[in-house]
Structures are given as structure tokens and as C-alpha cells.
Amino acid sequence: IDFVGQMHRAGVPLLAGTDEMAGFTLQRELELYVQAGISPAEVLKIATWNGAKYSGVLTDRGSIEVGKLADLALVEGDPTTDITALRRMAIVVTQGRSIDPSRVFTELGIRPFVTTAPHWETSLQ
């Protein structure tokens, strides 16, 4: 963990990503970046903007802007100040559809080790 913090302070670009199941281990990786001394807001940039930049797709991904593609995760809390808020997903929006994370877990037979946020009334129409 200390080495990651040292690399970040030295200006080495960091990318977030794992070889495991998407979501679960990535959340933990981002928490470890915060433990390494990187602010939660900067960790979110590493997980989004940096990935798009170094994958060569920054023109249409990596940030929320008009004309860019985006999948969104709405969480309970503010992950720019508390990275563990990423574990409290309320709604995931992908390809213009909203998905309740708890239903995905149930349908896949997964018992989540993350907490879903209280259900909000939502409508994307």
C-alpha cells in the first residue's frame, strides 16, 4: 500500500482494475488506494478518467459530459469524501436502463457482501 502512495506522489499514473469479478474487488482496490494516502476524489478519477485516457478512449468516455458514453452507479453517500459509499449502491444505469443491484445478486444466486442502499423511487422516463 505504501508503495502505491509513493508512486502516486511521484507522479506515476495509476489505473484501477482487477482480474477478478467486476465490482466487488474493484471496490476494495479503491479503498486500498485511499489507505495509501490518495484522496477519495482522486481515487475516483483514477478509476474513471485515467482508465479512459490510457485506453485511448477519453474522447467519449471517462467523465460525465454531454455527448460521452456513460454507465452510472448511484450510491448512498458521497464517494468523493468516503470511498466506502461505493459499497452502498442504490441504482446502476447502463445503456439507458436502471437496474436494482439487489435484484441482480438474487437472480445470479450471489449473496452480496456489499450493502445496497435503501430503495429510492426512480424513473428515468
Please identify what each model-predicted range represents.
Residues 79-85:
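Short, Lys/Arg- and Gly-enriched loop/turn segments at beta-strand edges
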